[in-house]
């Protein structure tokens, strides 16, 4: 009753999930009652012994599962052990909302019901595994559960609120600092670009700091194949953005900073399949109201950068990512569609506590 895989040596993986005859997920289990067998041993079995002895099996591999019956983690075949993570929530993330602990055998149940739900699994394999266009080492990024649920929920909310039928408020995502929001944006961009509903939209990614812009630019320009669009570019000025959008009816991913939008910014496009994704959406990207200042020369009226952005893209749908949600964020981008708190992030070993 055992499936033997023969390469340079014969190996017997504990479990293989086949889809249409392709071995897409490989499982390795260790006993929870054997003190000398750990989940890390399962990782080494996969990435050292199997990689050496039966590499052909992993030509089709999407991701791997390691488990000792208590700890259960998923990750890329190429990932270091610390980048294997538990899948702690089912499709509606109800477990965390109810405050139930998702450890031990519960984490196995949540992985099976969440990650291995048929629709979720096919969606993950199709849209949530990112391989960079170029890299000097073996890299494959598999989504974690907060990234998967956030991207899919935002995608559906954008469809619901897209202009002209909707109000253009695509929703707010509240994610703890350091939780991988840039990859969530990348996964969301892939969903939008591959959707027939949006008819090859134009995506504008907006930050409020040049270092954030540089970080996102490096990531997105190396993901053209994954996104499915060869036009992924940083915008150097308002005029550059105007030139890039002029005459464009579809497609393109453009990265810019909010400060490029001021009172001189003209209408860039009135298309409805333009999606603006704002990073750090609690800062300078929510100032839509008029400001009045009194100077020696009299009363001066002005608007913030966000007002000029919205005026230049009047029919776009706006999505906000933030680690610090405030009322103004939700006024501009809409209600919080999903959240990943610092408590969850610490529990998942994504961020660490600062104790003083």
Which residues fall in each region the model found?
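Conserved motor-coupling elements within RecA-like helicase/translocase cores
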Residues: 236-254, 267-271
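Conserved AMP-binding/adenylation subdomain of ANL enzymes
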Residues: 226-232, 349
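Signature of the SF2 helicase/ATPase Hel1-core->accessory helical subdomain module
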Residues: 39, 263, 269-356
